[in-house]
Amino acid sequence: MKIGVFTDSFRPYTSGVVRSIELFSREFNAKGHEVYVFGPDYPLLHPPKEEGVFRFVSVPWPTMPDFSLPVPISSQLGSTIKRIGLDIIHTHSPFLLGRLGARAARRYKLPLIFTFHTLYDQYVHYFPFVENTSKNVVQSIARNFCNRCNIVVAPSQLVVNYLQRIGVETSIINIPTGVDLEEFNNLETDWLEKNYDVSPDEKVLLFVGRLGKEKNVTFLLKCFQAVQARYPLCRLVLVGKGPQENYLRKLCREMGIEDKVTFTGVLPRQNIVHCYASADLFVFPSVTETQGLVIGEAKAAGLPVVAIRAFGPAETVMHGEDGFLTDLSPSSFVTAILDLLENKELYDRMSKQAYKNVAHISSSYCAEKMLDVYRELIDRKDFAPRKKKYKHKNVIGNDLHNFLA
């Protein structure tokens, strides 16, 4: 099977979307299939040429230097698709290259599948061309794109419910991004001690993710301040970078916890895995995750998780078994963390259960589920994606739809 992946982000940019594409692609290749990625170039990061990766001219985004916006124009796209002989197109964005992929699927009569990775209306603050547009319009763009596809993949059942609630009529199937369990063998459990200012006596609270507004890291710092006041021998390690990093560092200084918070920046994949192995507890305050892949990774390393009860984490964390889900309340979040730090029996039980509970979402198993969907679509032969005409009372919405359609 020859699979065309159209995405608005790809390595060397780091995100859950990129990680998902990498994991599925690797598993597809291992099972004898071919994956071709159509994604952005990153002129400031100089990505190496890779076989099977076709990059579009891109413009660095002013507020996020590591992110680039692809220009969805290519005189060679049609000939490339015909030369490869794609069997299916899988898009990972309802914008730009995702739209280009949808047009290509319609033109070449290929089945079109879309993974809804992101609650797009929660991220409009990053994009000036839609930031003044209502969240309802951004939601509408995503809904109408879903309705152009043959099948929509949602990484959690709560996202399936959300898509149905906003009016998606296309068939929706729940397939999470799996966890590569083999990554978590033979790890360095003292890697943080060797490479950062982490004492062997400290309990390490770990966060992995983008340091952006949508990840709610400010909330986490306030909670950690309260935890540290009661349990001084603990440290918070933040793995990742993002537009809020300088603000968060300043906040740590103002709160008097800068000596207890470690910022690692972006790390190579293997070092991220070592961070999981070196930590004691995974803390995740985001309320905008469709899945929260990092939670599954933390559980694969045997870390109990404390997260906010919202969308993806609400399904990924088994409350009371391998971690705690709390309301968006500092006191509840702090109490859950302290319960695990101060109760060794509870911690040990949840740590063992964490690994057991993640085994059912291995990357190999999830990839096979996705391949079954591909096969079903290809065999149906009635998959021609349809073009939607967008009609909105909102003038800005009309303009955006006409531009992006």
Please tell me what each predicted stretch does.
Residues V198-F224:
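Conserved donor-binding/catalytic core segment of Leloir-type glycosyltransferases
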Residues M1-V57, E368, R375, R386, ...:
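N-terminal subdomain of nucleotide-sugar transferases
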Residues V287:
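Aromatic "clamp/platform" in nucleotide-sugar-dependent glycosyltransferases that forms part
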Residues I81, C146, V266-L267, H274-A279:
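Short alpha-helical donor nucleotide-sugar binding micro-motif in glycosyltransferases
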Residues G39, R55-V57, K135, Q139-T189:
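Donor nucleotide-sugar binding/catalytic pocket of nucleotide-sugar-dependent glycosyltransferases
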Residues I295, P304-A307:
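Short hydrophobic beta-strand element within catalytic cores of glycosyltransferases
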